[in-house]
Amino acid sequence: MTGILIKLDDRPDIIFDNGTFYGGLHCGDCFNVQTNQWINVRLEYSDEWVVFYRGKSYPVPFGKRVEI
């Protein structure tokens, strides 16, 4: 299923194309983010929510299309 990555109640979540919510993402959850192509990332939390891609951390790409 695909949707848009959002922040809801201080936690990343996904709103799907049909209007339903995933229900909140958790540390260790993996999903695909659409950039120029689909990339697989892992969600983690330290001082803030980040995603890991190829061993590096990046800010969570809120507003991007994701696939889970």
Segments predicted by a language model, with ranges:
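Short coil-to-beta transition motif at edge beta-strands of beta-rich domains
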Residues: F21-T35
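Short, compact, well-ordered microdomains
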Residues: Q37-I68
